[in-house]
C-alpha cells in the first residue's frame, strides 16, 4: 500500500527542516557502527574500525549526505518510488551485491536520527509516516533482486 495523502503531507511539511549533511552523516554512521558487517560495502572509505573513526570519517559524511539527498528527491516522487529508484536498485543488486535487508536497516537508522534531530516534533504520527516512506524506499531498492 502506498503512502496516504496525510502521510505525504506530514513528510513534505517536515522534510524542509532536514540538514542532509548532518542527518546523513549520523544515520550512515549509526548503520556502520550498529551493523558492522555493512562496512564491507564501504572499504574505500578508509578507517571504520571504531565509532569515533566512523563518525569523523569524511567519506561517511559525504555518502550519508548523498543518500539523504536521494531520499529528499524520492519525496518528490512518492507516487512512483519504485520507478524513481529502479536504476539505483539494479546497481545495488547487480554491481554492488548489497544485502537488500540493509536498506531496511538504514531506514531504521535514519528514523532514529530524525527523532534525535526533530525532538518533540517527531510525533508518533510523523514517525509512522517516515517509517512508511522508508519501508517503501527499502522495497523499491530491493526490487532489483527479484
Curated annotation (Swiss-Prot):
This is Hemoglobin subunit beta-2. One of its GO terms (molecular function) is peroxidase activity. Heterotetramer of two alpha chains and two beta chains. Belongs to the globin family. CDD domains: Hb-beta-like (cd08925). Heme b binds at residues 63, 92. Residues 2-146 form the Globin domain. It holds the Pfam family Globin. Involved in oxygen transport from the lung to the various peripheral tissues. GO terms for cellular component: blood microparticle; haptoglobin-hemoglobin complex; hemoglobin complex. GO terms for biological process: hydrogen peroxide catabolic process. Red blood cells. Coiled coil: none annotated. PANTHER family: HEMOGLOBIN FAMILY MEMBER, HEMOGLOBIN SUBUNIT BETA-1. Keywords: Heme, Iron, Metal-binding, Oxygen transport, Transport. It comes from the Eukaryota. Gene3D superfamilies: Globins (1.10.490.10). The gene is hbb2.
